[in-house]
Amino acid sequence: MSKNSVIIVAAGKGKRMNSSISKQFLQIKNKPILYYTLNKFSTHESIDEIVLVALEDKIEVCSDIIDKYNINKVSKIVPGGKERQDSVYNGLKAVSKDCEVVLIHDAARPFVTSDIIENGIRYVNQYGAAACGVIPKDTVKIKDEKGFAIDTPNREDLFIVQTPQCFNYNIILDCHEKLKKHNKKVTDDTMVLENYGKSVYLYEGSYSNIKITTPEDLILGEQILEKLT
């Protein structure tokens, strides 16, 4: 029977947080951010397994969090790579052999909703690849190399991509292997497909589905959690 798998990428060092602790281990309401992220997927009925990608020296810390909070469905914890795309590739190689749909999600994005997860799976079955996100609230400018504004795109044409980014497993694995062969660099997994002419359907995420990257995000995260509980 085919499975829906999720790869949680927790191999970042969080330099922008100005903390010696990796952002996924910082706490909100006395629980680590990683707990909230793992728990959301482990309690979702459509998710069959979780592969957690972590810094090699943090694998034991991750294992302790999983045990402490009785997180189910984590099948493996694997070490990350030099770049995010290398970490994702390690995760892709570790999922179950009968995985059909794979969701790739940031560990530091703990407020993903059940609907976002479910819709991602549904759109993959329909289109082969999908990513959630939001239309920017602010006006966005394009500037030249000297720092002067040269254009103002229509906000309705712009999309701030979030995670999970969701794919047919064979498609994303094939594109990642081509990426390694061609030694290309990307900043997210939708770009992996774009490099090889594949389309990604963009669907509605949530303005609350933030990635906790800076100290200000921690404060906002506490406010979001209070509204959700």
Swiss-Prot record:
Question: Any idea of its EC number?
Answer: 2.7.7.60
Q: What pathway is this protein said to act in by its record?
A: Isoprenoid biosynthesis; isopentenyl diphosphate biosynthesis via DXP pathway; isopentenyl diphosphate from 1-deoxy-D-xylulose 5-phosphate: step 2/6
Q: Which InterPro entries match?
A: IspD, IspD/TarI, IspD/TarI_cytidylyltransf_bact, ISPD_synthase_CS, Nucleotide-diphossugar_trans
* Broad enzyme group: transferase
Q: Does the keyword Nucleotidyltransferase apply?
A: yes
Q: Name one GO molecular function term.
A: 2-C-methyl-D-erythritol 4-phosphate cytidylyltransferase activity
Site description Positions MEP for the nucleophilic attack, residues in chain: R155, K211
- Protein name stated in the entry: 2-C-methyl-D-erythritol 4-phosphate cytidylyltransferase
Q: Which CDD domains match?
A: CDP-ME_synthetase
Q: Tell me its family.
A: Belongs to the IspD/TarI cytidylyltransferase family. IspD subfamily.
Which residues does the annotation list for site: Transition state stabilizer? Answer: R16, K23
Key word Transcription present: no
State its role. Catalyzes the formation of 4-diphosphocytidyl-2-C-methyl-D-erythritol from CTP and 2-C-methyl-D-erythritol 4-phosphate (MEP).
Provide the alphabetized UniProt keywords: Isoprene biosynthesis, Nucleotidyltransferase, Transferase
Q: Which reaction does it catalyse?
A: 2-C-methyl-D-erythritol 4-phosphate + CTP + H(+) = 4-CDP-2-C-methyl-D-erythritol + diphosphate
Against Pfam families, the record matches this protein to: IspD
| Gene Ontology biological-process entries | isopentenyl diphosphate biosynthetic process, methylerythritol 4-phosphate pathway
Looking up HAMAP family in the UniProt record yields:
IspD
